[in-house]
Regions:
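A detector of low-complexity, intrinsically disordered, Ser/Thr/Gly/Pro/Ala-rich segments
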Residues: 4, 12, 33, 70, ...
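Acidic, serine/threonine- and proline-rich low-complexity intrinsically disordered segments
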Residues: 124-130
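Short terminal alpha-helical segments
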Residues: 7-46
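Short, aromatic- and cysteine-enriched interfacial helices/patches
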Residues: 5-6, 82, 140
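Compositionally biased non-globular segments, especially hydrophobic aliphatic-rich helices
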Residues: 15, 30-33, 37, 56, ...
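Non-Sec secretion/translocation targeting segments of pathogen effectors
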Residues: 131-140
Length: 140
C-alpha cells in the first residue's frame, strides 16, 4: 500500500520528495475513483448496501480513505447538504489549500447525501478498529 503523503507540494519540493508526493496523489485519485464506482454499484436509491468503508480501507488504507473523504467535504464546504458533524470531522484534516496541490483531483464527485452515508459508515468502521486496538493493548 502506498503511504499517504499529506504535505503540500511546495514542502515535497523542498524535501526532494516529489516522487512520494506524486505516488500518493495517484493513489488518492485511484481511491476517489474506487469510491465513486462503489457508490454507483451499491447505492440503490435509498441506502448504501454492503460494508463499503471496510472494503475501501482494506484496499487503500483507512488514512487515505479518510483523507479523500475529508478533502471532498472541505472542498464543497459551501454545500449545505453535507452534514454538520461530517464538516466538523473533515475540518480536523489539514488538507493543503494551495492551488498547486490540485486536491480537487481527488474530490469525490457524487451526491453529498450519499457521500454523507459513506462518511458515517467510514467513521463508525474506524471507531470500531480503534476500540479493537484499545482492547488488544489492554490484553497485553
Amino acid at each position: 500500500m502506498v503511504p499517504l503523503y499529506t504535505d503540500p507540494v511546495r514542502v515535497a519540493r523542498m524535501n526532494n520528495e516529489i516522487p512520494q508526493y506524486r505516488e500518493s496523489k495517484r493513489a488518492n485519485i485511484a481511491c476517489k475513483k474506487a469510491i465513486e464506482n462503489l457508490l454507483a454499484e451499491r447505492f440503490d436509491g435509498m441506502r448504501l448496501h454492503g460494508d463499503c468503508a471496510k472494503e475501501l480501507c482494506d484496499e487503500f488504507g483507512a488514512d487515505r480513505v479518510g483523507w479523500v473523504l475529508a478533502c471532498t467535504v472541505q472542498h464543497f464546504s459551501w454545500d449545505g447538504r453535507f452534514r454538520h458533524h461530517n464538516k466538523l470531522w473533515a475540518d480536523e484534516f489539514l488538507i493543503p489549500t494551495d492551488p498547486d496541490d490540485r486536491t480537487t483531483d481527488y474530490c469525490v464527485n457524487y451526491h453529498p447525501e450519499i457521500v454523507n452515508g459513506l462518511i458515517d459508515q467510514y467513521r463508525e468502521y474506524v471507531q470500531t478498529l480503534e476500540e479493537e486496538n484499545e482492547h488488544d493493548i489492554g490484553l497485553c
